[in-house]
């Protein structure tokens, strides 16, 4: 399986379990602070790589030490970074998040670098093009990006798109992102509950699917519901699957990991129920305690849990 992942690459600064370590019988320190390669496209790429997929990451970093270090770490994972551009005289985007069990508190992000849109020939050999964080990048709202997805679909490349949300309130993100222009070329569409509400003004999966179809969408929509699982909509059929109960340490990137593992199943020819169950288990096993890099599970560990699910 060969995949190109297009989207966000940043340096994540993650504080885990604040005020959990005691000093003089008072809980003062955080358990740890982790600095790691992050961003939607990175979590998707790492998860797919751990599943044995050949992954090419298409993203942008600055030419600072953070950017260089992240590329070294990703290449060692391994993730193919030959499509990552390093912008001269630029600082790599950094994001700060506080993680307290299943809760995550996004504190801020430095300016995002402009994303470049690859040429269709750059996708040579790809079976899947995964767009990670569509609404986050104005470059993805352009005719150039729309044409890339159109050409990819014409060449038989499966197109997956995780919509996400721009961190700005009071604007119509559906309108300014021109989502309706790309939906006809998308095979697998992902949205979390806040994105369903923010973009489509409803959390009802059937209602969301109806609106997507009115905009030309003809694929499979996966509505992510966190620990509660997901709802998969294909045509007029809805499949509801539960999540997995685990003790979460860090849920940053969990939606991206879910999308990656769902696509792994879809590209393997599985039905929507098995795809959803595999994604739920793989994600649950990825959000436990770790050091430096998430503990993405081996496929054998996922299959062992899947064998217990009805």
What are the residue ranges of the model-derived segments?
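Conserved phosphate-binding/catalytic region of the ribokinase-like
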Residues: 3, 150-154, 201, 205-310
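Hydrophobic beta-strand scaffold residues
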Residues: 55, 81, 159-160
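Glycine-rich phosphate/adenosyl-contacting loop at the front of the ribokinase-like
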Residues: 1-60, 65-72, 76, 249
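Conserved phosphate-binding/catalytic loop of the ribokinase/pfkB sugar-kinase fold
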Residues: 86, 97-139
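Structural motif
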Residues: 2, 127-128, 188, 220
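A glycine-rich helix N-cap at a beta->alpha junction
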Residues: 73-90
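Conserved beta-alpha-beta core of the PfkB/ribokinase-like small-molecule kinase fold
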Residues: 128, 133-210, 228-229
């Amino acid at each position: 399986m060969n995949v190109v992942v297009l989207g966000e690459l940043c340096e994540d600064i993650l504080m885990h379990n604040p005020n959990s370590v005691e000093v003089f019988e008072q809980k003062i320190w955080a358990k740890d602070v982790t600095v790691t390669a992050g961003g939607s496209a990175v979590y998707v790429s790492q998860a797919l790589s751990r599943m044995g997929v050949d992954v090419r990451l298409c993203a942008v970093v600055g030419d600072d030490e953070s950017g260089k270090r992240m590329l070294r770490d990703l290449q060692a994972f391994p993730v193919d970074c030959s499509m990552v551009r390093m912008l001269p005289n630029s600082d790599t985007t950094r994001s700060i998040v506080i993680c307290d069990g299943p809760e995550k508190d996004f504190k801020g992000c430095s300016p995002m670098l402009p994303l470049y849109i690859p040429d269709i020939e750059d996708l040579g050999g790809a079976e899947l093009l995964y767009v990670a964080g569509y609404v986050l990048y104005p470059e993805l709202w352009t005719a150039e990006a729309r044409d890339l997805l159109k050409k990819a679909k014409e060449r038989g490349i499966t197109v997956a798109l995780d919509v996400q949300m721009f961190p700005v309130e009071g604007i119509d993100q559906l309108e300014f992102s021109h989502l309706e222009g790309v939906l006809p070329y998308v095979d697998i569409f992902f949205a979390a509950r806040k994105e369903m509400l923010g973009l489509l003004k409803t959390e009802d999966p059937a209602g969301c699917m109806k609106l997507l179809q009115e905009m030309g969408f003809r694929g499979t929509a996966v509505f992510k519901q966190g620990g509660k699982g997901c709802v998969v909509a294909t045509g007029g059929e809805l499949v509801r699957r539960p999540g997995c109960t685990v003790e979460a340490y860090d849920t940053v990137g969990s939606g991206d990991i879910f999308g990656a593992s769902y696509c792994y199943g879809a590209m393997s020819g599985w039905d929507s129920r098995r795809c959803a169950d595999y994604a739920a288990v793989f994600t649950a096993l990825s959000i436990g305690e770790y050091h430096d890099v998430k503990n993405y599970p081996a496929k054998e560990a996922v299959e062992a849990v899947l064998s217990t699910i009805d």
